[in-house]
Amino acid sequence: MAASVENRQFRHEPGLSAAGVVRSFSPNHRRSDSPIRNCNYPAAAREFMTPKKLPPETYDTSDDEEDEADYRDAIKKSNSELESSVFDPRDQGTADQWIERNPSMVRLTGKHPFNSEPPLNKLMQHGFITPDPLHYVRNHGPVPNATWEDWTVEICGLVKRPARFSMTQLVNEFPSREFPVTLVCAGNRRKEQNLTKQTIGFNWGAAGISTSVWKGVPLVHILKRCGIYSRKKGALNVCFEGAEDLPGGGGSKYGTSIKIEMAMDPARDIILAYMQNGEKLSPDHGFPVRMIIPGFIGGRMVKWLKRIIVTTPESESYYHFKDNRVLPSHVDAELANSEGWWYKPEYIINELNINSVITTPCHEEILPINSWTTQRPYTLRGYAYSGGGKKVTRVEVTMDGGETWNVCTLDHKEKPTRYAKYWCWCFWSLEVEVLDLLSAKEIAVRAWDETLNTQPDKLIWNLMGMMNNCWFRVKTNMCKPHKGEIGIVFEHPTQPGNQSGGWMAREKHLEISSELAHPTLKKSVSSPFMNTTSLTFTMSEVKKHNSADSAWIVVHGHIYDCTSFLKDHPGGSDSILLNAGTDCTEEFDAIHSDKAKKLLEEYRVGELITMGYSSDSAASSPNNSVHGATNYLTLHLSLATIKEIAPTRSVALIPKEIAPTRREKIPCKLISKTSVSHDVRLFRFALPSPDQVLGLPVGKHVFVCATIDDKLCMRAYTPTSTIDEVGYFELLVKIYFKGVEPKFPNGGLMSQHLESMELGSSIEIKGPLGHIEYMGRGTFSVHGKQKFARKLAMFAGGTGITPDLSSDASYLKDPEDDTEMYVVYANRTEDDILLREELDAWADKYSDRVKVWYVVAKSIREGWKYSEGFITEDIMREHVPEVSEDTLALACGPPPMIQFAINPNLEKMGYDIKNSLLVF
């Protein structure tokens, strides 16, 4: 059904007192009762209803009082027919699991952090005021679990009277303003840019926009109270800083700044907001206090506000420079970093630009063509907005590519401020003849504001994908919704997040396919009602192809048959099989290069039918990944002699043999962190149930998954804990800090994220993955084929010791396993040797079975009795067994070590590295 925007003119009730719309507060995060719902005030809130004596310069709120009844009526309407928020299962195991959220919100960055927008048609159905649960959300990390009583906001820097205000002081000691403001993310409509060329941002659709009635303290009053200095004394910028601890820049708060002229301008209506739509802020929207800067992008409106600092330079926050910029189109990520484009002030975004969107017809809406529909006009609808308080004065629609334009009817539901500013979106509509739609190939819209700014015809790409405001185009196609009847199906350019659909996605993949000259690919469509010869499948059909006999995956709405690639996949066949029969868009994008993405096109067999289907990735369902199933039953039987595990003991990583369609990410909470050295940490993570074992076969590893800087990051790790540990597993991780290694100035993304994690926060794991599995007593399974050895030449470099360690531990626990292990372990210095105590203890206790030899690039202590330099042929001949039928070599370490030291020297020793070398 087409989305519609009702005509909701405000009623004017001049007799309503100011107290009639004051909202109550409770000291916790749950939404308080409100007089809008005819509820009684709690005693603690009565202080807010008592008129306060204000200084003579207090802002005159008489106009606000006249509008309050209008706001109340609009809020009531917007909240009607809104489903309740719930504790979403997708938040379980994350730092946000205590927050209730609306289940219809479209998640854009997986499970965590929570970045979301409402379905576009649902957003418009609620009209001018957006219900708080449907307001778009932009979070960079976990939501602070704040309390009203303990929260303070510090004012410092270039002020005469630095102060720290409690929430009670902000409410009682300052005048307040309450008025509607439209908030828009600078990334609104970014997915259109990503489908032109990938940016560094995630996929916002066209619903990264919302309007609320905000109430708070004018910033200018707070700065005056604290005695802000003049420009002559260096006060040039006002910086805002939030409470959350974020990974950006190696660890920082979210912060930004505006010029002092903006901060002190009463016409800007900048407030410290503590109420939204008549109630205290919800956690996702900044409880207990946030900035509202009307007419600006949402990225300047710091949530969970903790500090306001008046400074000479602009904010030095990582997020002030590395976010919310529109760089020239030729600047890519490498150039931006190498030439310092992030720090050029002319590319910062403050005020919104002019923009408009078609919301009716909605995506994949079908208009039947019959005697009834052709006798009456069809109404096109949408929204428009501009920045800086500029009024939208005109919206035009074209159905012939811009040759002619039709002027639309505008519906401005707000009154101008006393400074003639317009802070909210407006709605537009246009009646068109259905016969005109029949002849149109597309419908496009553009808006104008009072300074005659308008939207460009074509998209202008930029690295961050921000401020996209080209004409919004809806394509039309003929279809047959019912037998003997024709209709028009409408197609929006994109669908938000990793949802499939949209004419831009279809054209993008057709373009790629044309470049690859794929002979069998037909034109694809996203609607099942179109009369077409292309192969389309439902998700239920895809799920049937979840085995080695037929392994299908879905990526960006396109279906790929990877069966023939199983044997060639670098990560082994189970790297694909764990994913077979699922939509793995998010995780595929997280770990694959552009080369791999182009290679994937060779295996495309059709398109996913998207109508009525929400992809697993878009919904952050746990059943998406890119890697690995394992033969758990064989492992369990083969290693039963190591240690008996109760038959009823559950495992966290459920094997494919037991649950072929279950491929879940497992949330695991950090319960301890031990510093092993200056850059090595031992992390212990709790499994979901205290009586579980991890269930990871020896030799396999897991993916650790986290959303970092709004993108899914996945890294493979081998736990150092033994397979029979109950309730937890451990990871030994080397932290690659920013600014230490010149070749990698930004350091390790995942390792720094793990380092920044607080106890109680969570990551997700998925697996098992890997093509090598130790079955016990000298037997390995490699790509499903068995190999046997009595002697193992084991080479490790740096953190590559962890797979060897897990293997060693399992060998030594089985008294019947007489496999001999010869370990050569390379590091930079003695201090970099991991788990040396364990290795030396094993070599001492099992001297007939375990030999360990260390190699360091440079010794930093006297008396070093092992090798110095690199692994050489002489070292290998002296410390690993000669080639024989019952000898295997195992290696895990940096690629240069394996390529230039291990491989050539093993060949010199007579090893067949193709068949006798296993690389983890």
Swiss-Prot record:
Chain positions recorded as heme binding sites: H569, H592
InterPro entries reported for this sequence: Cbr1-like_FAD-bd_dom, Cyt_B5-like_heme/steroid-bd, Cyt_B5-like_heme/steroid_sf, Cyt_B5_heme-BS, FAD-bd_FR_type, Flavoprot_Pyr_Nucl_cyt_Rdtase, FNR_nucleotide-bd, Ig_E-set
Keyword Nucleotide-binding attached: no
Acidic residues biased stretches: 60-69
Reactions this protein catalyses: nitrite + NAD(+) + H2O = nitrate + NADH + H(+)
Secretion signal, residue range per the UniProt entry: none
Keyword Iron (UniProt): yes
Bilayer-crossing regions: none
Binding site for FAD: 715-718, 732-737, 744, 749-751, 802
Subunit structure: Homodimer.
Name of the protein in question: Nitrate reductase [NADH]
The species this protein was found in: Cichorium intybus
Designated gene of the protein: NIA
